[in-house]
């Protein structure tokens, strides 16, 4: 992909950061995150990513352009608080889709955590949903399932 204007949310995350860095070489990439770590922001900016501090839980995209070609939504919350995790993992995806309604494509990154654990069987898109992260992250699976419903 070259010459596109791309928004990447959760830009400081382990999945989004290498994608943002790679795409910034040939595109106008905007990275949205809380940017609580100044070094993470600096690394992205040095690669040419335009960084915008955004609190996805608040659903406020003021100051963030809407004229992107593509949105890659990698934002995630695993706080254990239902209000925050549903706001970030589900509600904000819908609000962001509305804010950037003219995009060519909106990629929403979900998680294998949305599936019911099938023992040793491989998972597919048709696998049954389930709350398989309850012991470790009690809000994660359900809030990610909610996000899939919002963007469907």
Language-model-detected regions and their locations in the chain:
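NAD(P)-cofactor binding segment of oxidoreductase domains
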Residues: 70-71, 80-108, 150
């Amino acid at each position: 992909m070259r010459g596109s204007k791309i928004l990447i949310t959760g830009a400081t995350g382990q999945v989004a950061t290498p994608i943002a860095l790679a795409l910034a070489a040939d595109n106008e990439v905007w990275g949205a995150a809380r940017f609580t770590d100044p070094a993470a922001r600096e690394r992205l900016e040095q690669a040419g990513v335009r960084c915008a501090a955004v609190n996805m839980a608040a659903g406020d995209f003021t100051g963030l352009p809407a004229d992107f070609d593509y949105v890659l939504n990698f934002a995630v919350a695993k706080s254990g608080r239902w209000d925050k995790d549903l706001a970030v993992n589900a509600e904000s995806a819908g609000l962001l889709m509305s804010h950037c309604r003219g995009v060519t494509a909106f990629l929403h990154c979900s998680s294998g955590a949305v599936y019911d654990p099938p023992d040793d069987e491989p998972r597919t898109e048709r696998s049954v949903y389930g709350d398989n992260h309850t012991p470790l992250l009690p809000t994660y699976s359900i809030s990610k399932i909610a996000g899939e419903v919002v963007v469907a």
